[in-house]
Design a protein with these regions (language model features):
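Structural preference for solvent-exposed beta-strand-turn elements
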Residues: 1-378
Length: 378
């Protein structure tokens, strides 16, 4: 095997697989801590897996001798990140299992190689139906949901995914919860999937995190998504990212949403709201994580009292007339949500001191968020 490849692109791809490689476990001799490289035609195929997640990408390469090898992934990335030339030449020694890497005057050889047949075969999910969604939309949906996943419980350790068919188009919806908050976000897609095709899949948290990282490296391209019975595959350009789906049964979130009936609605400027929460955070602690909202005519007072640290409060003028209301929420829940939203304003829908808060974005009907209240400790 002998080929030349763009150094920067190879580093980018090797960096992308590290989250998968790290999952291989503490046995560093495991083949799962290796990356599979195959030079064929005019491309280099890069494959990494931990059985639950599989990453396959194809890079343009000048291939002089075709072949394949497994190389310790972290070591290969360490080597490649030290190289400064635009092109790196890589070859496999004919006499022993050793990979030679050269760039400019720098020359490495690594013995941490295994035969290609040791690597697990790649079996992507098969389905006649796929959908296409823009990278920008998929990234927004992921950002607006991944923060409220509960990793400790199998049935909610991931994003519930379903297809919603509306008159305005077909939407891919993701729903996440940790039992104390619920996030719903959806994005328009192109394709022939109907509501029965996806059949309420549960995407695991680790896959969501890897997808979120991958979307940051692409621009206006589209993702093609395929759902099998037990697997899903997200592909873009020459990259395929496939993973096993979770078995858990997600709670009936529609039942939760149908019980909401907020009669007090307040619109806040997100930037100002976030700024106040930062000041609230000065006095939050493990024993005092809640922030109190006191709503009255034309005013919302946000406050915290920590018996060990001190207190803070700040008023926001609001367009509200009605009964007074005091309600407390986790400071971190609102902080997480505001950090995920790209919006100028947010609307809080309230109804009583022990009922959930419905958070929406004015002018948008593709997302909503539910936050459970806390007992007022201040």
């Amino acid at each position: 095997m002998q080929f030349s490849i763009n150094t920067k692109e190879f580093v980018r791809v090797l960096s992308s697989i590290q989250g998968i490689i790290d999952k291989a476990g503490q046995n560093q001799q495991s083949i799962l801590s290796y990356v599979y490289l195959q030079a064929i035609d005019s491309q280099l195929i890069v494959n990494a897996t931990n059985f639950n997640l599989t990453f396959v990408d194809r890079l343009e390469a000048t291939v002089e001798v075709e072949g394949a090898i497994c190389v310790k992934a972290q070591r290969l990335l360490q080597i490649m990140k030290t190289l400064h030339g635009s092109v790196t030449k890589i070859s496999l020694s004919k006499t022993e299992m050793r990979l030679n890497i050269s760039c400019g005057k720098s020359k490495f050889n690594t013995k941490e190689c295994n035969p290609p047949d040791d690597f697990p075969p790649y079996n992507p999910p098969k389905s006649d139906k796929t959908l296409s969604i823009s990278n920008k939309v998929l990234r927004r949906v992921l950002i607006e949901t991944v923060f409220s996943v509960k990793p400790e419980r199998e049935e909610i350790n991931g994003a519930h995914v379903e297809v919603i068919n509306k008159e305005s188009g077909n939407f891919l919806r993701m729903v996440t919860t940790d039992g104390h908050r619920l996030s719903i976000s959806e994005g328009l897609f192109a394709g022939d999937m109907d509501e029965t095709a996806v059949d309420r899949k549960l995407l695991p948290q680790k896959a969501l995190q890897e997808l979120l990282s991958l979307t940051a490296t692409y621009g206006e391209q589209d993702w093609t998504i395929t759902f099998g019975d037990r697997q899903a595959c997200f592909s873009i350009e020459k990259l395929e990212f496939s993973f096993s789906l979770n078995d858990g049964k997600f709670p009936d979130y529609n039942k939760i949403c149908s019980k909401l009936s907020p009669d007090k609605n307040v619109i806040l400027e997100k930037k100002e709201f976030s700024s106040i929460l930062k000041r609230v955070g000065v006095f939050t602690s493990k024993n005092t994580p809640s922030v109190k909202f006191s709503l009255s005519d034309q005013n919302l007072d946000i406050s915290i009292k920590n018996p060990d640290m001190g207190s803070f409060n700040e008023d926001i003028p609001v367009n509200y007339q009605g009964d007074n209301l005091e309600i407390s929420f986790s400071f971190h829940f609102f902080q997480d949500l505001l950090g995920a939203l790209d919006a100028e304003n947010v609307q809080l829908g309230l109804n009583g001191s022990m009922n959930p808060c419905l958070v929406t974005v004015p002018g948008r009907d593709d997302c909503q968020f539910i936050i459970m209240p806390m007992r007022n400790s201040s």
